């Protein structure tokens, strides 16, 4: 008895030379309704993504070397070491992989079988089957996946500015803490001088022991405040080190101008500029386009794919017979025409459009809140600098001189000193609010340069409609 053996070899499927290559930049989104024209995302400083493996093993900057002092140095360290950016870049690579996979053609299926293994009527056959995808389903699926790629690219841009916002906030918070230490040192010096004057007057019989004790308490309070301010300096340095993703980095005295002049912004123009410049609406538009492509993909799903099978069969016997096998199969969309998924895809488009509107409204609200904080703190800073602080400092100097000559009581000097303390601290807090507002506005506008200058969007001259406001003249 002659036996026939059908052997299956290991096949290596090699991509055709004309296979579609992955573009470095995804093509512009396709939106079927009027709206903001979409453009490719702006470039983000990063390492090449030719090989996805290095995304998870990129070396971190060394902690040794020059201690950063300027904001630009801290930003550079953060962009090279922050895990948020590495995660966002890896998400882009993952989305690109899904887009490549979406258009890969189904693999052929090979089979070998024998309905009857032994005997003079034994049969041996081998077949090859292939699914032929119709109606451009693979192309539509890849187009939807490409929108996810572009959405991930916009999210990388947003992640980068999130990191910049954290670094900028931590940087100027530490700068404010440095200024607080300087103020508390000044107040401690004032308290020590007041204590010395009170002690001398008590020894001369012009003061009392109670006066000396009061000034001793004020001196001790000023010293404790200085110690506490030093604690905030240390914690602020650790927060800044964490913001650049180098928690053990050594941070010294920062080199920046806390009193730098900043521009004013017009609210309506700023809100429009934020919606245009921010990456969140662009990512939402990418999601709308993805939903539209998914609707087209769902619409062609009922069109059946074709399954074609061909093969060879050998029947052993007398006489032996060679036969060819052919089979064509397809699904008949009689009951399931993908009605539910089509309905769901249409709802996803409506939901995505609503999400875009929600994002635009939230950004406009954030811009209004940031401008409110920024304008009020800016006005406070200007008034403290020009009018309030000079008066408070002059009051303390005059009161100290009068108290040394015994012309005023210690209560008057104490009150003047407290006014100066409250004024100096309020001035510092106004500076902190001013810089927080500037950081928030720059984050919403996604400004590369910080602090913002006169070339930033929505900047106006800081002039009131009826002229600048000034305090009332003294009576």
Regions found by a protein language model. Name each.
Residues 82, 89, 96, 103, ...:
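Alpha-helical coiled-coil heptad-repeat register
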Residues 73-79, 207, 211-221, 246-308, ...:
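Amphipathic alpha-helical coiled-coil scaffold segments and their short linker/junction regions
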Residues 143-146, 209-218, 410-418:
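Short, charged, amphipathic alpha-helical segments
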Residues 158-275, 370-373, 377, 420, ...:
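Periplasmic alpha-helical coiled-coil/stalk elements that build and connect Gram-negative outer-membrane
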Residues 24, 31, 55-68, 108-144, ...:
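Small/polar, glycine/serine/threonine/aspartate-rich low-complexity segments that form flexible
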Residues 76-86, 93-107, 126-144, 153-161, ...:
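A glycine-/polar-enriched beta->alpha junction
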Residues 39, 46, 159-160, 224-246, ...:
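Short segments within alpha-helical structural elements
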Residues 3, 7-10, 14-42, 426-475:
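Acidic, low-complexity, intrinsically disordered peripheral segments
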């Amino acid at each position: 008895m002659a036996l026939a053996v059908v052997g299956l070899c290991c096949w290596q499927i090699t991509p055709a030379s004309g296979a579609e290559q992955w573009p470095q930049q995804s093509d512009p989104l396709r939106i079927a309704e009027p709206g903001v024209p979409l453009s490719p995302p702006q470039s983000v400083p990063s390492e090449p993504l030719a090989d996805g493996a290095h995304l998870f093993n990129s070396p971190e900057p060394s902690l040794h070397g020059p201690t950063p002092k300027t904001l630009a140095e801290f930003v550079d360290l953060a962009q090279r070491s922050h895990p948020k950016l590495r995660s966002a870049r890896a998400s882009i690579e993952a989305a690109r992989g899904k887009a490549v996979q979406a258009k890969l053609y189904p693999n052929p299926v090979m089979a070998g079988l024998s309905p009857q293994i032994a005997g003079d009527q034994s049969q041996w056959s081998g077949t090859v089957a292939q699914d032929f995808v119709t109606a451009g389903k693979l192309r539509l699926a890849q187009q939807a996946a490409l929108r996810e790629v572009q959405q991930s690219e916009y999210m990388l841009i947003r992640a980068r500015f999130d990191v910049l916002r954290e670094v900028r906030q931590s940087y100027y918070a530490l700068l404010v803490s440095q200024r607080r230490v300087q103020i508390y040192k000044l107040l401690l010096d004032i308290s020590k001088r007041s204590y010395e004057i009170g002690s001398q007057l008590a020894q001369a019989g012009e003061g009392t022991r109670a006066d000396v004790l009061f000034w001793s308490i004020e001196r001790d309070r000023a010293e404790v405040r200085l110690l506490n301010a030093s604690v905030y300096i240390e914690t602020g340095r650790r927060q800044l080190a964490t913001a650049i993703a180098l928690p053990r980095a050594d941070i010294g005295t920062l080199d920046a101008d806390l009193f730098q002049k900043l521009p004013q912004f017009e609210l309506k123009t700023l809100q429009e500029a934020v919606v245009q410049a921010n990456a969140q609406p662009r990512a939402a538009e990418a999601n709308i386009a993805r939903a539209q492509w998914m609707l087209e993909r769902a619409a062609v799903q009922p069109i059946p794919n074709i399954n074609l099978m061909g093969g060879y069969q050998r029947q052993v016997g007398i006489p032996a017979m060679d036969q060819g096998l052919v089979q064509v199969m397809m699904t008949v969309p009689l009951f399931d025409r993908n009605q539910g998924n089509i309905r769901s895809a249409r709802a996803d488009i409506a939901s995505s459009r609503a999400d875009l509107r929600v994002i635009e409204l939230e950004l406009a609200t954030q811009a209004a809140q940031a401008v409110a904080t920024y304008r009020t703190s800016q006005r406070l800073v200007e008034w403290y600098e020009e009018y309030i602080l000079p008066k408070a400092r002059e009051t303390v100097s005059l009161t100290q001189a009068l108290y040394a000559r015994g012309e005023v009581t210690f209560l008057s000097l104490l009150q003047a000193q407290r006014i100066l303390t409250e004024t100096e601290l309020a001035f510092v807090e106004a500076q902190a609010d001013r810089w927080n507002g500037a950081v928030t506005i720059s984050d919403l506008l996604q400004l590369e340069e910080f602090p913002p200058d006169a070339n930033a969007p929505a900047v106006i001259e800081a002039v009131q409609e009826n002229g600048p406001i000034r305090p009332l003249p003294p009576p």
